[in-house]
Amino acid sequence: MSLSESLAKYGITGATNIVHNPSHEELFAAETQASLEGFEKGTVTEMGAVNVMTGVYTGRSPKDKFIVKNEASKEIWWTSDEFKNDNKPVTEEAWAQLKALAGKELSNKPLYVVDLFCGANENTRLKIRFVMEVAWQAHFVTNMFIRPTEEELKGFEPDFVVLNASKAKVENFKELGLNSETAVVFNLAEKMQIILNTWYGGEMKKGMFSMMNFYLPLQGIAAMHCSANTDLEGKNTAIFFGLSGTGKTTLSTDPKRLLIGDDEHGWDDDGVFNFEGGCYAKVINLSKENEPDIWGAIKRNALLENVTVDANGKVDFADKSVTENTRVSYPIFHIKNIVKPVSKAPAAKRVIFLSADAFGVLPPVSILSKEQTKYYFLSGFTAKLAGTERGITEPTPTFSSCFGAAFLTLPPTKYAEVLVKRMEASGAKAYLVNTGWNGTGKRISIKDTRGIIDAILDGSIDTANTATIPYFNFTVPTELKGVDTKILDPRNTYADASEWEVKAKDLAERFQKNFKKFESLGGDLVKAGPQL
């Protein structure tokens, strides 16, 4: 079947030109053309990378995510009053109209068609075809997904198709049961995703992550929102779970270790494997000193999003006037220390949960029991500091099951069950690492956090003397090489330890309230959480 014929199946006709699997050189030329206007236009920065703006949407739009309700989607973890999530149902009738709208938008014009893999394991990867009219969106997926060899592209038949019609608006969204003129919709029967009225690149990346999160656990394979790395021999694999901004990319990109990937992984009988062929790093306040590897990856073929660039092409990473969620996507080979030739490694021995606790309660590292591992995985806690009108900064807690509830398409307990089975089989140990704040009012330094990670990875934490933290019953080391001893017990960072107690009780209550929805899983699990 010719490419035009396959596009016609998706409702796209009359393409005036199809650029199929463009090279980085072709994309650079296309996205920086002087004739481009608005959000299509890329600006070349002095670092060599192109910067683009994504308009109103500088992040994903979870309120606009829908899944077609049909026989193929019966296993989906639908949103409910008890378990609010982003998996909202939409009808087949609405889907037909949205597909026609995307088809109309993408017809009779030049297009980019990019064929890529999601998943480094041949047996379980998805073959994905992306169709879009915007050059830099084709660049984004070329950076972020796994690029097939010429041999693999011969006779490429997609398992999943993504139509990105970011210029089209859903005018009749109310009658279709949608939330706004924007829609990100999946149809599991047709194996297709449609994107309408949002330019944010991450919708394509996280859309396919949601699909891997559906297909893999049903086969007993863990699908995880985590980064992963291994030692220089490729034997001592570690995975880092965490929500956005907790340090997944920063901590897994370590000059002493080989990076497997920075955000999405599977864990099967062969070990841990990356879903992606690139990294999508936050760049707010990025510095060469603190994150040399990420800094070095921002060069020609990297794609910056929503950063401020002056007339001379100079980038201001501290400027968050457009968004705090400034990003860069780059092919994984922009990082020197990576696992080659395929981003996979043996089963993990160390599982690290990253949490940026703005309450200043959690220890910088806790050694978790098996039941605590399940409890804190299902809780998926982090907290942000949100400014209030009078300049007081109040911590806002986030509980996101499995450190990625926004991307789960099956119930959280399924992911926990599969992860724990994999950990038991490999003898992996789990640790909760707080990359947030303590009683000093300052964020725990990257230097101390890196020292903690080193102690986890070299095993020295397992032989350290320990103490127990009240309410949470956490086991914490009392001394670790290269880490300020004072911070290991969070109570020592407060001028008055009773201040920690007040905050600890408050946070413990929040954990208990959040976990009520999992109480049916049994008393042992509930007891593994904070006790007042």
From Swiss-Prot:
Residue sites binding substrate per the record: 60, 200, 206, 244, 327
Pfam families (alphabetical): PEPCK_ATP (PF01293)
Family: Belongs to the phosphoenolpyruvate carboxykinase (ATP) family.
InterPro entries to which the protein is assigned, alphabetical: PEP_carboxykinase_ATP, PEP_carboxykinase_C, PEP_carboxykinase_N, PEPCK_ATP_CS
Record-level GO BP terms: gluconeogenesis
Cofactor or coenzyme needed: Mn(2+)
Protein name per its UniProtKB record: Phosphoenolpyruvate carboxykinase (ATP)
Subcellular location: Cytoplasm
EC number: 4.1.1.49
Comment on pH dependence: Optimum pH is between 6.7 and 7.1. The enzyme is stable from pH 5.0 to 9.0. It completely losing activity at pH values lower than 4.5 and retaining some activity in the pH range 9-12.
Catalysed reaction equations from the record: oxaloacetate + ATP = phosphoenolpyruvate + ADP + CO2
Residues in coiled coil: none
Organism lineage string: Bacteria, Pseudomonadati, Pseudomonadota, Gammaproteobacteria, Aeromonadales
Gene (name only): pckA
GO molecular function term, any single one: metal ion binding
Free-text comment on the cofactor: Binds 1 Mn(2+) ion per subunit.
Binding site for ATP: 206, 225, 242-250, 291, 327, 443-444, 449
Subunit structure: Monomer.
